[in-house]
Amino acid sequence: MSAASLYPVRPEVAATTLTDEATYKAMYQQSVVNPDGFWREQAQRLDWIKPFSVVKQTSFDDHRVDIKWFADGTLNVAYNCLDRHLEERGDSIAIIWEGDDPSEHREITYRELHAEVCKFANALRGQDVHRGDVVTIYMPMIPEAVVAMLACARIGAIHSVVFGGFSPEALAGRIIDCSSKVVITADEGLRGGKKTALKANVDRALTNPETSSVQKVIVCKRTGGEIEWNRHRDIWYHSLLEVASSTCAPKEMGAEESLFILYTSGSTGKPKGVLHTTAGYLLYAALTHERVFDYRPGEVYWCTADVGWVTGHSYIVYGPLANGATTLLFEGVPNYPDITRVSKIIDKHKVNILYTAPTAIRAMMAEGTKSVEGADGSSLRLLGSVGEPINPEAWAWYYNTVGKQNCPIVDTWWQTETGGILISPLPGATALKPGSATRPFFGVIPALVDNLGNLIEGAAEGNLVILDSWPGQSRSLYGDHDRFVDTYFKTFRGMYFTGDGARRDEDGYFWITGRVDDVLNVSGHRMGTAEIESAMVAHPKVAEAAVVGVPHDLKGQGIYVYVTLNGGEEPSDALRTELRNWVRKEIGPIASPDFIQWAPGLPKTRSGKIMRRILRKIATAEYDALGDISTLADPGVVQHLIDTHKTMNAA
């Protein structure tokens, strides 16, 4: 597919949208010319206890990086997500929970959610949890995880959600870094028909002597599986709720007080605890949720992420609930019990908006039309993509097969550190180009710079930076502001460096080319791995591809590609040659792969991110330097790749 393919805004979408093109242009212009005025007006969507007088106090100067929004105002996040909705929509559904087993589901109204949050907030207070204390949440995708987050917000405790797929060692590192006082977990998790020993993992994590800050472990009963019990430390969630009052006054919190810490995955060394604060984060999550997804009251909105990632925080919990939306919480995986699961959930719950990851889209696409067999899908109005750049072929399949050419796709780009979406189409305002995140959201000023930090104008490729602050921006790394400054503001002074490369086309649309550390330098030519991967996946026999650089005597770096074929396709030397020629045709001879390794699967985190670090190590035969692979969705993939690599080398 040509990158120039353009999908204009559909007239029926433009006629009913919250934000048409003229509105977008006017609002964006105001947001960058007069950010104080723009955000002062937008902040009225929140309920304040003490109104703010000052809007924006921010500096990107690397000698004094300081980010404050609405600093003298006070409010409570849980109040904004629950209490203020009770009068008008107390009996409306807040959360639809779909269990791992298709026979399990629950609907929870705003009134019911409010009562449970108040009870659990009181229970936490009863366990000596107070404003500023850190609570670690290590739970499956069940409503109690959302309750725990909101209960912390209600009493001013800081939550640190750790994804349930992380190992005991990774969990311990995150507990130690923030001196967590309480850990909330479940007996076991359920995912894809398999049980995860969450409580046992917590027990193992807490054998580390440096986790001594933890005083209590609160355990939610999910499976009823047998677990070890420490009667001095462990408490059942349900027993706390049985005796707790459902009345709990929300704590008045300063706009810049900490709301949560979220540790970024995949980084080496000490975990990086991204810190988000109260008012700016909530405002930005709510506004982006409303405008990017063009959300209307009463619609069913489904983000398939896990609450252990920032997408789950902003677009399952805080954004939707602040807007009084109905948010769907899914415990399982897209291919269990079979590949039709996503389609069946859409029809079962009459989902209007689906926000998922390219990994899930490609998994469905690899099965052809099987994933939508027998599906109606007529409730869908809008599709979204998040987590990595989506290649044009997967975009087109998503648009044609899942959306039946009726649903715009919002291809969103953002990061844990940004708090919310920074670059994305708005359904009623933006003509779509498959593979492009298109244009910046209100208040966001993206730019491209060369490696010396010089701004690049017009159609070009470079390092993606943001020139000024926005309310959802992370304020620091927990307990390590110097590292925050060094990581994001030292590379290009006076700018926030995203770590991503991007291309801007002649229409001003942005195309994310991948992490800058995923840029190859082949014979002096810079190439994003995403570009080569997109070309490879465009081949009709290829389901997925991952590209890494390897040392090359002549070129400096060679191109090493791991290829997963579609179901029913067989690997062969002839196909290898065909794929090399295909990439030469799609991009040019410079992008021709030096090595192609067949892969039954790729090493991915549970959120679907490919762990390229592991692929690089395998490609260079550094089998003993892979690091911790326990966080992978399927650690067994790694040994298969190593064995195949050894066989290739021996041949």
Swiss-Prot record:
Cofactor(s) of this protein: Mg(2+)
Record note on modification: Acetylated. Deacetylation by the SIR2-homolog deacetylase activates the enzyme.
Any one annotated GO CC term: cytosol
One MF annotation (Gene Ontology) recorded for this entry: acetate-CoA ligase activity
InterPro entries on file: Ac_CoA_lig (IPR011904), ACAS_N (IPR032387), AMP-bd_C (IPR025110), AMP-bd_C_sf (IPR045851), AMP-binding_CS (IPR020845), AMP-dep_synth/lig_dom (IPR000873), ANL_N_sf (IPR042099)
E.C. number(s) listed in UniProt: 6.2.1.1
PROSITE patterns: AMP_BINDING (PS00455)
This protein's record includes keyword Protein biosynthesis: no
Residues holding Mg(2+): V537, H539, V542
Record-listed ATP binding positions: G387, E388, P389, D411, T412, W413, W414, Q415, T416, D500, R515, R526
Catalysis: reaction(s): acetate + ATP + CoA = acetyl-CoA + AMP + diphosphate
Modified residue annotations for N6-acetyllysine: K609
GO annotation, biological process: acetyl-CoA biosynthetic process from acetate
Matches recorded under Gene3D superfamilies: 3.30.300.30, N-terminal domain of ligase-like
Binding site for CoA: R191, G192, G193, K194, T311, N335, S523, R584
Keywords of this entry: Acetylation, ATP-binding, Ligase, Magnesium, Metal-binding, Nucleotide-binding
Top-level taxon of the source organism: Bacteria
Role of this protein: Catalyzes the conversion of acetate into acetyl-CoA (AcCoA), an essential intermediate at the junction of anabolic and catabolic pathways. AcsA undergoes a two-step reaction. In the first half reaction, AcsA combines acetate with ATP to form acetyl-adenylate (AcAMP) intermediate. In the second half reaction, it can then transfer the acetyl group from AcAMP to the sulfhydryl group of CoA, forming the product AcCoA.
Family that this chain belongs to: Belongs to the ATP-dependent AMP-binding enzyme family.
Protein name: Acetyl-coenzyme A synthetase
Lineage of source species: Bacteria, Pseudomonadati, Pseudomonadota, Gammaproteobacteria, Pseudomonadales
